[in-house]
Regions:
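Active-site phosphate-binding strand-loop segment of PLP-dependent enzymes
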Residues: 1-2
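A short linear hydrophobic-aromatic micro-motif
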Residues: 5, 85-88, 116-122
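Short, acidic/turn-prone active-site loops that include or flank metal/cofactor-
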Residues: 8-11, 123-125
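PLP-dependent aminotransferase class I/II
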Residues: 9-82
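Short acidic/glycine-enriched loop/turn segments that link adjacent beta-strands
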Residues: 17, 93-94, 125-129
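Short hydrophobic/aromatic beta-strand micro-patches
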Residues: 24, 98-100, 134-136
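Conserved PLP-binding catalytic core of the aspartate aminotransferase-like
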Residues: 69-70, 74, 80-114
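PLP-dependent enzyme catalytic core of the Aspartate aminotransferase-like
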Residues: 113-114, 123-150
Length: 150
């Protein structure tokens, strides 16, 4: 839908909590939004943070972080797929993986014992055996895989 494409400034720039983004939309939608937004809808500290985060040097760092996450996501996905008890790892373009386990409660218990937090998706229809695992550093991901391999 070309008239409703919304693009947020992503976490790669370290601005997830700044509530800054862009809107690409039909002129009528933009006009409507402008009519309801306060005159200073974005706080000055947020504007300054965005300007700093989007500077060329910071953009290079963000691209490097994204590349590292992509590499680590592929490595973690392969490691998880090779574990006994993992029945499916969904493909992902995000910084997390959705993983199905034959015994998700057991996997969750092991991860909690290791003081590793994951998102429990078992209460969602069709995902009754799934946990969402955020891609961490290589060391964090190795620890996660070791915890599940026991």
């Amino acid at each position: 839908h070309a008239d409703r494409a919304i693009e947020a400034v992503i976490q790669a720039f370290g601005l997830a909590g700044a509530r800054i983004g862009t809107l690409i939309a039909d002129a009528r939608i933009v006009s409507l939004l402008r009519s309801v937004l306060p005159p200073y809808a974005i706080a000055q500290p947020c504007i300054e943070a965005a300007q700093q985060a989007l500077a060329p040097a910071q953009q290079r760092l963000a691209r490097e972080r994204v590349a590292a996450i992509v590499r680590e996501r592929a490595r973690l996905s392969a490691a998880l797929a090779g574990l006994a008890g993992v029945t499916h790892v969904w493909p992902s373009d995000a910084n997390f993986l959705l993983v199905e386990f034959d015994e998700p409660a057991r996997a969750l218990s092991r991860l909690r014992e290791a003081r590793l937090l994951v998102r429990d998706f078992r209460d969602r229809p069709g995902l009754e055996r799934a946990l969402r695992i955020t891609v961490g550093s290589p060391e964090q991901n190795d620890r996660l895989v070791r915890s599940l391999a026991c």
